[in-house]
Amino acid sequence: MYGDIFEEEMNRETVFRDASKLMPEYVPQVLVHREEEFRQLTRFFKPVLENRSSQRVLITGSVGVGKTVLARRFGAELEKAAGSRGMNLTYLHINCRKDRTIYSVIAKILQHFNPRWPYYGLGPEKLLNDVVNYLNSRDAYLTVTLDELDFFVQQNGPNLVYSLTRTAEERGGPNRISLIAIARDKSFLRSLDAATQSTFMHNVIALDRYSASQLKDILLSRIREAFKHGVVEEDTVDLIADIASRWGDARFALELLWRAGMAADAEAAGVVTPEHARKAKAEVYPEIKREVLRDLQLHEKLTLLAVARKLNLSKRAYAFTGDVEKTYRVVCEEYREEPRRHTQFWEYLQRLNALGVVDIKPSGLGQRGQTLKISIQEVPAEWLEKEMEKLLREK
Ligand SMILES: Nc1ncnc2c1ncn2[C@@H]1O[C@H](COP(=O)(O)OP(=O)(O)OP(=O)(O)O)[C@@H](O)[C@H]1O
Ligand SMILES: [Mg+2]
Protein backbone atom coordinates (compact mmCIF):
# COMPACT_ATOMS: atom_id res chain seq x y z
CA MET A 1 0.00 0.00 0.00
CA TYR A 2 2.73 2.48 0.92
CA GLY A 3 4.51 1.59 -2.27
CA ASP A 4 1.40 2.68 -4.16
CA ILE A 5 1.19 5.93 -2.27
CA PHE A 6 4.82 6.55 -3.09
CA GLU A 7 4.31 5.96 -6.80
CA GLU A 8 1.13 8.00 -6.83
CA GLU A 9 2.89 10.95 -5.26
CA MET A 10 5.88 10.59 -7.58
CA ASN A 11 3.63 10.65 -10.62
CA ARG A 12 1.39 13.38 -9.38
CA GLU A 13 0.83 16.16 -11.84
CA THR A 14 2.94 19.18 -10.89
CA VAL A 15 3.31 22.75 -12.05
CA PHE A 16 6.97 22.83 -11.06
CA ARG A 17 9.91 22.09 -13.26
CA ASP A 18 12.38 22.65 -10.43
CA ALA A 19 11.00 24.00 -7.15
CA SER A 20 14.49 24.29 -5.63
CA LYS A 21 14.98 27.39 -7.78
CA LEU A 22 12.53 29.12 -5.45
CA MET A 23 14.38 28.34 -2.24
CA PRO A 24 16.03 31.24 -0.42
CA GLU A 25 19.52 29.69 -0.80
CA TYR A 26 19.40 29.55 -4.57
CA VAL A 27 21.53 32.19 -6.26
CA PRO A 28 20.06 33.02 -9.67
CA GLN A 29 22.36 33.66 -12.62
CA VAL A 30 20.68 36.96 -13.32
CA LEU A 31 19.86 39.62 -10.77
CA VAL A 32 17.05 41.73 -12.07
CA HIS A 33 17.18 45.47 -11.31
CA ARG A 34 20.47 45.40 -9.43
CA GLU A 35 22.89 46.21 -12.27
CA GLU A 36 23.74 49.65 -10.91
CA GLU A 37 24.49 48.30 -7.43
CA PHE A 38 26.57 45.51 -8.90
CA ARG A 39 28.52 48.10 -10.87
CA GLN A 40 29.06 50.19 -7.76
CA LEU A 41 30.38 47.17 -5.90
CA THR A 42 32.73 46.42 -8.78
CA ARG A 43 34.06 49.97 -8.68
CA PHE A 44 34.75 49.65 -4.96
CA PHE A 45 36.70 46.45 -5.58
CA LYS A 46 38.67 47.66 -8.58
CA PRO A 47 41.69 48.59 -6.41
CA VAL A 48 41.65 45.13 -4.84
CA LEU A 49 42.31 43.56 -8.23
CA GLU A 50 44.50 46.34 -9.61
CA ASN A 51 46.68 47.23 -6.64
CA ARG A 52 46.13 44.19 -4.45
CA SER A 53 44.88 46.42 -1.68
CA SER A 54 42.03 45.59 0.68
CA GLN A 55 38.56 47.02 0.75
CA ARG A 56 35.59 47.39 3.08
CA VAL A 57 32.08 47.85 1.85
CA LEU A 58 28.75 47.95 3.62
CA ILE A 59 25.53 46.80 1.95
CA THR A 60 22.33 47.96 3.63
CA GLY A 61 18.63 47.52 2.99
CA SER A 62 15.49 46.11 4.55
CA VAL A 63 14.39 42.49 4.49
CA GLY A 64 14.37 40.71 1.14
CA VAL A 65 15.82 43.50 -1.00
CA GLY A 66 18.59 41.27 -2.33
CA LYS A 67 21.55 42.07 -0.06
CA THR A 68 22.66 38.46 0.33
CA VAL A 69 22.11 37.50 -3.26
CA LEU A 70 23.94 40.59 -4.52
CA ALA A 71 26.98 39.80 -2.38
CA ARG A 72 27.01 36.14 -3.41
CA ARG A 73 26.65 36.93 -7.07
CA PHE A 74 29.35 39.55 -6.79
CA GLY A 75 31.64 37.18 -4.91
CA ALA A 76 31.41 34.61 -7.69
CA GLU A 77 32.31 37.21 -10.32
CA LEU A 78 35.09 38.62 -8.17
CA GLU A 79 36.73 35.22 -7.84
CA LYS A 80 36.49 34.70 -11.57
CA ALA A 81 37.84 38.15 -12.44
CA ALA A 82 40.72 37.72 -9.99
CA GLY A 83 41.55 34.28 -11.38
CA SER A 84 41.75 35.57 -14.91
CA ARG A 85 44.23 38.18 -13.67
CA GLY A 86 46.44 35.60 -12.04
CA MET A 87 45.35 36.56 -8.55
CA ASN A 88 44.52 33.86 -6.06
CA LEU A 89 41.40 35.29 -4.40
CA THR A 90 38.78 33.40 -2.45
CA TYR A 91 35.31 34.66 -1.72
CA LEU A 92 33.64 33.43 1.42
CA HIS A 93 30.10 34.16 2.54
CA ILE A 94 29.40 33.83 6.23
CA ASN A 95 26.03 34.29 7.84
CA CYS A 96 26.68 35.73 11.27
CA ARG A 97 23.22 34.81 12.51
CA LYS A 98 24.12 31.15 12.03
CA ASP A 99 27.77 31.39 13.01
CA ARG A 100 27.10 33.24 16.14
CA THR A 101 30.44 33.66 17.85
CA ILE A 102 33.72 35.26 16.83
CA TYR A 103 35.29 31.89 17.25
CA SER A 104 32.93 30.08 14.92
CA VAL A 105 33.25 32.74 12.22
CA ILE A 106 37.03 32.54 12.23
CA ALA A 107 37.02 28.76 12.46
CA LYS A 108 34.79 28.78 9.40
CA ILE A 109 37.36 30.80 7.48
CA LEU A 110 40.15 28.45 8.49
CA GLN A 111 38.14 25.37 7.69
CA HIS A 112 37.33 26.67 4.29
CA PHE A 113 41.02 26.53 3.45
CA ASN A 114 41.59 23.25 5.16
CA PRO A 115 38.75 21.20 6.64
CA ARG A 116 41.26 19.28 8.75
CA TRP A 117 42.86 22.30 10.28
CA PRO A 118 43.32 21.66 14.00
CA TYR A 119 41.48 24.53 15.55
CA TYR A 120 39.84 23.15 18.65
CA GLY A 121 40.88 24.82 21.84
CA LEU A 122 42.68 27.68 20.12
CA GLY A 123 41.66 31.30 20.66
CA PRO A 124 40.31 33.44 17.84
CA GLU A 125 43.45 35.60 17.76
CA LYS A 126 45.63 32.58 17.16
CA LEU A 127 43.27 31.27 14.52
CA LEU A 128 43.21 34.56 12.71
CA ASN A 129 46.99 34.63 12.75
CA ASP A 130 46.94 31.23 11.11
CA VAL A 131 44.66 32.58 8.41
CA VAL A 132 47.01 35.48 7.73
CA ASN A 133 50.02 33.14 7.63
CA TYR A 134 48.21 30.88 5.25
CA LEU A 135 47.32 33.74 2.90
CA ASN A 136 50.87 35.14 3.06
CA SER A 137 52.49 31.80 2.35
CA ARG A 138 50.38 31.30 -0.79
CA ASP A 139 50.24 34.89 -1.93
CA ALA A 140 46.49 34.52 -1.61
CA TYR A 141 43.65 36.98 -0.93
CA LEU A 142 40.35 36.66 0.80
CA THR A 143 37.09 38.55 0.58
CA VAL A 144 34.68 37.72 3.35
CA THR A 145 31.06 38.74 3.51
CA LEU A 146 29.78 39.08 7.05
CA ASP A 147 26.06 38.73 6.44
CA GLU A 148 23.56 39.90 9.07
CA LEU A 149 26.42 41.54 10.89
CA ASP A 150 24.23 44.04 12.74
CA PHE A 151 22.67 41.23 14.68
CA PHE A 152 26.06 39.73 15.48
CA VAL A 153 27.59 42.99 16.69
CA GLN A 154 24.60 43.61 18.91
CA GLN A 155 25.22 40.26 20.60
CA ASN A 156 29.02 39.99 20.54
CA GLY A 157 30.31 43.53 20.29
CA PRO A 158 32.76 44.92 17.72
CA ASN A 159 35.72 42.56 18.22
CA LEU A 160 35.21 40.39 15.16
CA VAL A 161 35.28 43.30 12.75
CA TYR A 162 38.15 44.84 14.64
CA SER A 163 40.27 41.68 14.46
CA LEU A 164 39.51 41.05 10.83
CA THR A 165 40.48 44.55 9.85
CA ARG A 166 43.53 44.90 12.09
CA THR A 167 45.34 41.60 12.40
CA ALA A 168 47.09 41.84 9.06
CA GLU A 169 47.80 45.53 9.40
CA GLU A 170 49.40 45.13 12.80
CA ARG A 171 51.75 42.54 11.42
CA GLY A 172 52.85 44.76 8.57
CA GLY A 173 52.77 43.67 4.96
CA PRO A 174 49.74 43.83 2.70
CA ASN A 175 46.29 43.36 4.12
CA ARG A 176 44.93 40.44 2.17
CA ILE A 177 41.49 40.38 3.74
CA SER A 178 38.64 42.48 2.33
CA LEU A 179 35.25 42.72 3.95
CA ILE A 180 31.71 43.11 2.75
CA ALA A 181 29.42 43.79 5.68
CA ILE A 182 25.67 43.35 5.36
CA ALA A 183 23.16 44.94 7.72
CA ARG A 184 19.65 46.33 7.74
CA ASP A 185 20.97 49.86 8.21
CA LYS A 186 24.07 51.81 9.21
CA SER A 187 23.23 52.25 12.87
CA PHE A 188 25.27 49.27 14.08
CA LEU A 189 28.43 51.03 12.87
CA ARG A 190 28.20 53.24 15.92
CA SER A 191 29.45 50.42 18.09
CA LEU A 192 32.61 50.02 15.99
CA ASP A 193 35.76 52.06 16.46
CA ALA A 194 36.00 55.38 14.64
CA ALA A 195 38.51 54.26 12.01
CA THR A 196 36.54 51.18 10.97
CA GLN A 197 33.33 53.17 11.04
CA SER A 198 34.63 55.74 8.65
CA THR A 199 35.95 53.28 6.06
CA PHE A 200 32.58 51.58 5.92
CA MET A 201 30.74 54.92 5.91
CA HIS A 202 32.47 55.90 2.69
CA ASN A 203 31.56 52.71 0.91
CA VAL A 204 27.88 52.11 1.46
CA ILE A 205 25.59 50.52 -1.05
CA ALA A 206 22.01 51.10 0.04
CA LEU A 207 19.45 48.87 -1.62
CA ASP A 208 15.92 50.24 -1.97
CA ARG A 209 12.79 48.21 -1.57
CA TYR A 210 11.47 46.79 -4.80
CA SER A 211 8.43 48.30 -6.49
CA ALA A 212 5.57 46.13 -7.72
CA SER A 213 6.84 46.23 -11.28
CA GLN A 214 10.39 45.29 -10.22
CA LEU A 215 9.00 42.43 -8.19
CA LYS A 216 7.05 41.30 -11.22
CA ASP A 217 10.24 41.14 -13.27
CA ILE A 218 11.98 39.18 -10.53
CA LEU A 219 9.06 36.76 -10.37
CA LEU A 220 8.91 36.33 -14.13
CA SER A 221 12.58 35.53 -14.39
CA ARG A 222 12.31 32.96 -11.60
CA ILE A 223 9.13 31.45 -13.04
CA ARG A 224 11.04 30.55 -16.19
CA GLU A 225 13.50 28.55 -14.10
CA ALA A 226 11.17 26.97 -11.59
CA PHE A 227 7.86 26.31 -13.36
CA LYS A 228 6.74 24.47 -16.42
CA HIS A 229 6.06 26.65 -19.40
CA GLY A 230 2.86 28.69 -19.20
CA VAL A 231 1.45 27.28 -15.96
CA VAL A 232 1.54 30.49 -13.92
CA GLU A 233 -1.20 32.87 -15.01
CA GLU A 234 -0.16 36.49 -15.54
CA ASP A 235 -2.85 37.70 -13.13
CA THR A 236 -1.27 35.55 -10.46
CA VAL A 237 2.09 37.20 -10.99
CA ASP A 238 0.55 40.67 -10.84
CA LEU A 239 -1.28 39.85 -7.66
CA ILE A 240 1.79 38.44 -5.92
CA ALA A 241 3.90 41.42 -6.99
CA ASP A 242 1.23 43.76 -5.63
CA ILE A 243 0.95 41.99 -2.32
CA ALA A 244 4.72 41.84 -1.79
CA SER A 245 5.28 45.44 -2.89
CA ARG A 246 3.84 46.62 0.40
CA TRP A 247 7.13 45.43 1.90
CA GLY A 248 9.24 45.65 -1.25
CA ASP A 249 10.43 42.21 -0.27
CA ALA A 250 11.51 39.76 -2.99
CA ARG A 251 11.81 36.87 -0.54
CA PHE A 252 8.18 37.26 0.41
CA ALA A 253 7.18 37.44 -3.26
CA LEU A 254 9.08 34.24 -4.09
CA GLU A 255 7.70 32.43 -1.09
CA LEU A 256 4.17 33.37 -2.10
CA LEU A 257 4.91 32.10 -5.57
CA TRP A 258 6.25 28.82 -4.23
CA ARG A 259 3.30 28.28 -1.87
CA ALA A 260 0.86 29.21 -4.63
CA GLY A 261 2.47 26.49 -6.75
CA MET A 262 2.13 24.05 -3.86
CA ALA A 263 -1.53 24.96 -3.47
CA ALA A 264 -2.05 24.36 -7.20
CA ASP A 265 -0.36 20.97 -6.93
CA ALA A 266 -2.44 20.00 -3.93
CA GLU A 267 -5.51 20.33 -6.15
CA ALA A 268 -3.72 18.89 -9.17
CA ALA A 269 -4.92 22.06 -10.87
CA GLY A 270 -2.19 22.19 -13.50
CA VAL A 271 -2.19 26.01 -13.42
CA VAL A 272 -1.38 28.54 -10.72
CA THR A 273 -4.30 30.94 -10.35
CA PRO A 274 -4.78 34.12 -8.28
CA GLU A 275 -6.87 32.09 -5.86
CA HIS A 276 -3.82 29.92 -5.19
CA ALA A 277 -1.85 33.09 -4.49
CA ARG A 278 -4.52 34.24 -2.06
CA LYS A 279 -4.39 30.90 -0.30
CA ALA A 280 -0.63 31.23 -0.11
CA LYS A 281 -0.95 34.72 1.35
CA ALA A 282 -3.02 33.34 4.22
CA GLU A 283 -0.12 31.16 5.34
CA VAL A 284 2.96 33.32 4.82
CA TYR A 285 4.04 36.04 7.15
CA PRO A 286 6.76 38.34 5.88
CA GLU A 287 7.43 39.51 9.43
CA ILE A 288 9.12 36.23 10.26
CA LYS A 289 11.67 34.68 7.96
CA ARG A 290 11.51 30.97 7.40
CA GLU A 291 15.30 30.71 7.59
CA VAL A 292 15.36 32.31 11.00
CA LEU A 293 13.09 29.58 12.37
CA ARG A 294 14.90 26.85 10.50
CA ASP A 295 18.36 27.92 11.67
CA LEU A 296 17.47 27.97 15.36
CA GLN A 297 19.26 25.41 17.47
CA LEU A 298 17.28 22.43 18.69
CA HIS A 299 16.48 23.74 22.16
CA GLU A 300 15.69 27.19 20.85
CA LYS A 301 13.15 25.51 18.59
CA LEU A 302 11.74 23.57 21.53
CA THR A 303 11.53 26.78 23.57
CA LEU A 304 9.75 28.61 20.78
CA LEU A 305 7.34 25.75 20.36
CA ALA A 306 6.63 25.95 24.08
CA VAL A 307 5.89 29.69 23.85
CA ALA A 308 3.62 29.20 20.85
CA ARG A 309 1.81 26.29 22.41
CA LYS A 310 1.30 28.04 25.72
CA LEU A 311 -0.13 31.13 24.04
CA ASN A 312 -2.24 29.11 21.66
CA LEU A 313 -3.73 27.03 24.48
CA SER A 314 -4.32 29.88 26.89
CA LYS A 315 -5.57 32.30 24.21
CA ARG A 316 -4.01 35.07 26.30
CA ALA A 317 -1.83 37.93 25.07
CA TYR A 318 1.06 37.06 27.37
CA ALA A 319 2.61 34.00 28.92
CA PHE A 320 4.79 34.06 32.00
CA THR A 321 8.27 32.60 31.90
CA GLY A 322 7.57 30.07 34.65
CA ASP A 323 4.59 28.65 32.76
CA VAL A 324 6.46 28.56 29.48
CA GLU A 325 9.31 26.73 31.15
CA LYS A 326 6.87 24.07 32.33
CA THR A 327 5.53 23.72 28.81
CA TYR A 328 9.11 23.54 27.55
CA ARG A 329 9.71 20.50 29.79
CA VAL A 330 6.63 18.80 28.41
CA VAL A 331 7.71 19.59 24.87
CA CYS A 332 11.18 18.18 25.56
CA GLU A 333 9.65 14.96 26.80
CA GLU A 334 7.51 14.73 23.69
CA TYR A 335 10.59 15.04 21.51
CA ARG A 336 12.68 12.83 23.78
CA GLU A 337 15.15 15.54 24.63
CA GLU A 338 16.70 16.21 28.01
CA PRO A 339 15.43 19.65 29.11
CA ARG A 340 18.21 22.16 29.72
CA ARG A 341 18.72 24.03 32.96
CA HIS A 342 16.86 27.16 33.85
CA THR A 343 19.72 29.51 33.02
CA GLN A 344 20.02 28.07 29.56
CA PHE A 345 16.30 28.19 28.98
CA TRP A 346 16.56 31.84 29.90
CA GLU A 347 19.23 32.37 27.27
CA TYR A 348 17.11 30.72 24.58
CA LEU A 349 14.33 33.14 25.38
CA GLN A 350 16.71 36.08 25.19
CA ARG A 351 17.94 34.97 21.82
CA LEU A 352 14.43 34.50 20.46
CA ASN A 353 13.74 37.99 21.71
CA ALA A 354 16.85 39.37 20.01
CA LEU A 355 15.80 37.72 16.75
CA GLY A 356 12.41 39.42 17.04
CA VAL A 357 10.50 36.14 17.06
CA VAL A 358 9.07 36.72 20.52
CA ASP A 359 8.71 39.83 22.58
CA ILE A 360 9.75 39.85 26.21
CA LYS A 361 9.11 42.38 28.91
CA PRO A 362 9.04 42.51 32.70
CA SER A 363 5.73 41.38 34.09
CA GLY A 364 5.71 43.63 37.12
CA LEU A 365 5.12 40.50 39.16
CA GLY A 366 7.58 38.57 41.30
CA GLN A 367 10.81 39.77 42.77
CA ARG A 368 13.09 42.25 41.09
CA GLY A 369 11.63 41.69 37.67
CA GLN A 370 12.51 37.99 37.73
CA THR A 371 9.26 37.12 36.03
CA LEU A 372 8.90 38.14 32.43
CA LYS A 373 5.92 38.11 30.19
CA ILE A 374 6.28 36.83 26.69
CA SER A 375 4.17 37.57 23.67
CA ILE A 376 4.14 36.71 20.00
CA GLN A 377 3.16 39.72 17.97
CA GLU A 378 3.93 39.05 14.36
CA VAL A 379 2.12 35.81 13.59
CA PRO A 380 -0.70 33.71 15.02
CA ALA A 381 0.54 31.44 17.80
CA GLU A 382 -1.31 28.57 16.19
CA TRP A 383 0.56 29.06 12.93
CA LEU A 384 3.89 29.25 14.73
CA GLU A 385 3.11 26.11 16.72
CA LYS A 386 2.48 24.20 13.49
CA GLU A 387 5.59 25.59 11.82
CA MET A 388 7.78 24.62 14.75
CA GLU A 389 6.29 21.12 14.89
CA LYS A 390 7.01 20.72 11.20
CA LEU A 391 10.60 21.88 11.62
CA LEU A 392 11.16 19.64 14.63
CA ARG A 393 9.80 16.66 12.77
CA GLU A 394 12.27 17.27 9.94
CA LYS A 395 15.16 16.86 12.39
N1 LIG B 1 17.24 41.41 -7.98
C1 LIG B 1 16.90 40.14 -7.77
N2 LIG B 1 16.81 39.29 -8.81
C2 LIG B 1 16.47 38.00 -8.59
N3 LIG B 1 16.22 37.48 -7.38
C3 LIG B 1 16.29 38.30 -6.32
C4 LIG B 1 16.65 39.66 -6.46
N4 LIG B 1 16.66 40.23 -5.24
C5 LIG B 1 16.31 39.28 -4.37
N5 LIG B 1 16.10 38.12 -5.00
C6 LIG B 1 15.71 36.87 -4.36
O1 LIG B 1 14.86 37.19 -3.26
C7 LIG B 1 15.19 36.44 -2.12
C8 LIG B 1 15.62 37.35 -1.01
O2 LIG B 1 16.84 37.97 -1.34
P1 LIG B 1 18.03 38.08 -0.30
O3 LIG B 1 18.09 36.86 0.50
O4 LIG B 1 19.25 38.48 -1.02
O5 LIG B 1 17.48 39.29 0.59
P2 LIG B 1 18.22 40.03 1.79
O6 LIG B 1 18.22 41.47 1.46
O7 LIG B 1 19.50 39.39 2.06
O8 LIG B 1 17.17 39.79 2.98
P3 LIG B 1 17.47 39.63 4.56
O9 LIG B 1 17.66 41.00 5.11
O10 LIG B 1 16.21 39.06 5.08
O11 LIG B 1 18.63 38.73 4.72
C9 LIG B 1 16.26 35.45 -2.55
O12 LIG B 1 15.65 34.26 -2.92
C10 LIG B 1 16.88 36.12 -3.76
O13 LIG B 1 17.39 35.15 -4.66
MG1 LIG C 1 20.15 38.19 3.63
Roles of regions detected by a PLM:
Residues 1-55, 77-80:
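A short, basic N-terminal segment
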Residues 2-16, 54, 97-218, 226-244, ...:
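Mid-core helix/loop region of P-loop NTP-binding domains shared across ATPases and GTPases
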Residues 52-75:
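Walker A/P-loop nucleotide-binding motif
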Residues 56-58, 81-97:
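Conserved catalytic segments around the Walker B and adjacent sensor/switch elements
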Residues 245-250, 258-272, 311-314, 332-333, ...:
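AAA+ ATPase "lid" subdomain C-terminal helix
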Residues 264-288:
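Conserved C-terminal helix/linker of AAA+ ATPases
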Residues 286-318:
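Short alpha-helical segments that sit at the start of domains
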Residues 311-395:
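Terminal-proximal interaction/regulatory segments of ATP-powered molecular machines
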